[in-house]
Amino acid sequence: MQEIISQIASLISKFNKENNLNLQIFLKGSYLFWKENFISRKPNDLDLGFVNCSFSQRQEFINFILQEKNAELIKKDDNLQILKINGFIIEFIVLETINKQFLKESQYKNIYELKIKYAFFQKITMIGYVLSPVFPHDSNKKMLSIIDDLNISWNILSKNPDNINYQSEKNFFQNSLWNSFFIYWFYNYDKMLDKYFDFLKLKSYNNYFDQSLKNYIYNFLTFIKEQFKDNLDFLDKILKNKLIYTNMMLNFLNFPSIPGFEKKYVEKLFADNIHKKTNGGYLSKNNKNNNVLFINHSDEVGGIAIAGEVFNQGTAYFDSGVFEIFDQNSEKINEISCVKVDNLVFSEEKSAKINRPNLKCLGIPENGIYQVLPKSEVKISGFTIFSRNQDNKISNILARILLDIDKNFDILLTTKAEIQLQGTKDFFVTNQVKKYKFLVNIDVCDDQNWDDEGIKIRVADTFTAHNIVFYNKIVEIFQKNSIPFRPYFGSGWTDITNFQNQNAITLSIPVSKIHSNSSLSLIKNFFFLLWICKEINDNIF
């Protein structure tokens, strides 16, 4: 077994050198108990996870291993990938991420080990899965194996109270619940198993446990259900409504809403959740306290057809191809082929000020005004969200789901933001904003590392100064909830630009491209931000 781990370590070093990366993995599962001489039973396989890399790098490394002559693929989906190296089974759990604070270095470079106390905790939390209807193997056989390992480990670990103290390990359990949630989401489970664990199912195994261990496990599992009730309720509701939320993405990520045409889009997405509206913005008012206001743009960049010619509104991103034509009510009327027009006579800055068509299209009616957008298909996979331009649709859908999960949010949708932030200059918008203590702008940002886990916090940009006091409050909430984040300096403006003298900040989901016909974001980051918004709304004063 050590030879296999050594070979994997060599492959990581080779992979990192060839790609100028710092990929690291960690060992977990029964191997750790065997290595520490807790159990004599030699594991049948190695369980591995990734420490600090993007999801594309994870897959690239697995593919790199499979190039070896002695490696073969046994089973694969986007999460579980089982390999055989020299006849030994290696299992990668791609969706699982463990914070480095819960790991220790092994004797092998770039390979960490889950600390034994956390491996012990994981073995206990595994009971809920093994005793659930979704467990695909012999649950009784697996339970007896788990109990044997726990009894032996308990006799050793319980000698030091620090090894079994779970009350002080909130961050670890938050990390673990997120891992469980994303795996449940991927495999279409309809509930958080930890929330519904039935202690009666353990009763038939009571005589197999060491008595003190049995009491410990009951208290341990009760602690999880009680201390993380809010987390479990939140994640459980998402799983129960997965079809609704994915359909919301499928139906609205490509719904047309260029500047000035937002009305139909907002009314269909938010329906009776809108309580006040003007041409400059839409307000969903649900909280009696004017404490936190969440702000979104509601428009997107695109083309407007006037007298049969197409002009750009907002940042240009068109390429030649198939385009869709929508009327003023956002109803699709046609698909046409268009050719991109490059106005190269003048500089890019001057070209933007000259009223020249940006597309050459045939078949646009000359007697009306239409929205013109590139045709694109929305795809929701186990890992990613793919659509046309996710700026600003993904933020709007996130805000709408917030209202479904908890009606206690105040949300302001501004209009015409893609043409010089016109919505933030509207009297209704500015009048609403002045009433609140804290402003949180939900946004996306262009990031080549879009499939790294973590929300980006905009500290400042070329139009907005920092607010370090409010920034530190937000960071504290991220850290308290074990949600990864990255501070950054923005490259453009947001709604916050015009409100920066208040307690205002922008939280962004990284995407592969902002203004593009093909934009990708990570599902993990969508739900991380969803939870953070709830925590900000509940806990910042």
Predicted regions and their residues:
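Catalytic cores of NTP-dependent nucleotidyl/adenyl transfer enzymes across multiple folds
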Residues: 9, 84-235
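A structural signal for isolated positions on well-ordered beta-strands in alpha/beta enzyme cores
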Residues: 24-26, 47, 91, 293, ...
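N-terminal hydrophobic/helix-forming segments and targeting peptides
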Residues: 223-541
